[in-house]
């Protein structure tokens, strides 16, 4: 699993030393070893990698990662560029942005540009088993 290396580390590093975190880390490692889990392990903390704490302007909180191939990559509501279908939850966000603010609706669901602009795209759960919603 990719480690956090920016200013988020100072803010949350104390959690990494606590017993619950060590147990959780071990559990997640075992899940990755025995089954398919999304996002890929190196992408789990992408929300923190792409949006440093000092750059956060707004939080867009999702529930859990998408659970199918070529979707989850560590940013809530975002899918990888090769995924041509925009998930319904993101379609709803795009529709609201268009209806309320007149924003352009992109033809893809890759939101890294939002993250780079200070939108923290974080799920309340960072990993999910393939094809199973709400698994852990």
Where would I find each of the regions flagged by the language model?
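A polyanion-binding, active-site-adjacent surface
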Residues: 2, 14-136
């Amino acid at each position: 699993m990719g480690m956090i290396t920016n200013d988020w580390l100072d803010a949350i590093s104390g959690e990494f030393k606590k017993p619950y975190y060590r147990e959780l880390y071990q559990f997640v490692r075992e899940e990755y070893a025995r089954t398919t889990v999304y996002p890929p392990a190196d992408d789990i903390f992408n929300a923190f990698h792409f949006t440093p704490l000092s750059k956060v302007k707004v939080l867009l909180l999702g529930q859990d990662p998408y659970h199918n191939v070529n979707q989850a990559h560590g940013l809530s509501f975002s899918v990888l560029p090769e995924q041509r279908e925009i998930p319904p939850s993101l379609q709803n966000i795009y529709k609201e942005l268009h209806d309320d603010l007149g924003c352009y609706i992109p033809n893809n669901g890759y939101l890294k540009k939002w993250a780079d602009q200070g939108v923290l795209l974080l799920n309340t759960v960072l990993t999910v088993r393939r094809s199973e919603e709400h698994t852990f």
